[in-house]
Amino acid sequence: MTDNNKYRDVEIRAPRGNKLTAKSWLTEAPLRMLMNNLDPQVAENPKELVVYGGIGRAARNWACYDKIVETLTRLEDDETLLVQSGKPVGVFKTHSNAPRVLIANSNLVPHWANWEHFNELDAKGLAMYGQMTAGSWIYIGSQGIVQGTYETFVEAGRQHYGGSLKGKWVLTAGLGGMGGAQPLAATLAGACSLNIECQQSRIDFRLETRYVDEQAKDLDDALARIAKYTAEGKAISIALHGNAAEVLPELVKRGVRPDMVTDQTSAHDPLNGYLPVGWTWEQYRDRAQTEPAAVVKAAKQSMAVHVQAMLDFQKQGIPTFDYGNNIRQMAKEEGVANAFDFPGFVPAYIRPLFCRGVGPFRWAALSGEAEDIYKTDAKVKELIPDDAHLHRWLDMARERISFQGLPARICWVGLGLRAKLGLAFNEMVRSGELSAPIVIGRDHLDSGSVSSPNRETESMRDGSDAVSDWPLLNALLNTASGATWVSLHHGGGVGMGFSQHSGMVIVCDGTDEAAARIARVLTNDPGTGVMRHADAGYDIAVDCAKEQGLDLPMITG
């Protein structure tokens, strides 16, 4: 049966305050975060349930959304809701320390794990692409990836430019839910940036939310602005309406030399996320319905041109890296044999953090009050007094990042500190310092929760890039530890067949029971990241495991 229930002309907004609409905060929290994912301030295309990342949805269709909401409002604290690719399929008796929701999205048996088969199922209403935090109900807008992008740019500055990006500029493309973080991250890291985007509506959204500073009228204007701002040492972000597969080759032809090149277009999904050269967006969307194979071919041909230009920049000695959208794979399939000559961002800049379980720890204020986030910011500084880099991030985040939907914060911390912060937040709820409970979650892009050979697990030391036992173990352990909701997805970030990953969210409601769950979950979750990297032979991870007292029988036993 074809699914015709993916569009509804409605605006969704999560309830605010401390009055429950469900039976407890353990069910109110997933309800509010589901709704928050579809807030028009948060989602890319909420009327079609699309949160970010091409077609990353929060629910399979509107009938499923309605039934999820209805079920969460009646769910008891000894029951668990099962969600299968965005559809609520069952409620079962469990116990009070079990997750209230268990989610599996987009998972396919490996032989069938490709876009063609998935799209057939999607068209029949039998599947949903959950991306990473879209279908797991913990997306917080572009802030969710700002710090990770910032950390990447800062580390690139350390490695290539002596620790400073002042007077430098980044060339990139894509201003969607993930890519939209790039201009602000570059600015916070001290660099100018030129951000190419083919949809004017996305540029408008990033201008409105202050993620990008200016829009140039054409390429010449953009380059003039870049030249002016870099000469003045100013970190200003510039958007340019255009197609990266046209603009990058033109820049190569002109001999323009950026200081860093990357990309965050939705190249992972050629049918829905990458505009072929010479096409309008309307043509692209229409032909995706009538000629999907031709659309995919045209998109991948344009990606090949795009990647070739990136390779041309790299040949000039310009730091060039993939930012996790699988564009190198798409280009390789289209004949660019050396597409992987430039690295992904994780092996190039982020893996040492993952070895210590450091990753995108995030929290949201269910109250809707910004002041609750500012109080937690202060608590983080109090509990981690000597980390000047982290303090600078929090100060910049408060000054520059506009909240989208429920106020939230992201803060990269690792094993040991996550549990410490979570317990402190729970105590703040208990004492009344915070006006309502907090939810703590993370991106699936974390140290122990994803297997993705072209992104997070690219070039693992022991060659275990494609082993996907690790996110399964992470999901199982978070379930056993008492996370409030746990998710297990396929295909996020890099597309069907290229990743498996898991997520968790835990509620801080101020109770003793919550404190026990928080201590378990926020220790065990990052602990799996240290375990995974120690098992792969990374000395940093082995040392961290020993320092933190992890029991790893083959390593610390």
UniProtKB/Swiss-Prot annotation:
Transmembrane segments: none annotated. The keyword NAD applies. It is an enzyme of class 4 (lyase). It catalyses: 4-imidazolone-5-propanoate = trans-urocanate + H2O. InterPro entries: Urocanase, Urocanase-like, Urocanase_C, Urocanase_central_sf, Urocanase_CS, Urocanase_N, Urocanase_Rossmann-like, Urocanase_sf. Catalyzes the conversion of urocanate to 4-imidazolone-5-propionate. This is Urocanate hydratase. It comes from Pseudomonas putida (strain W619).
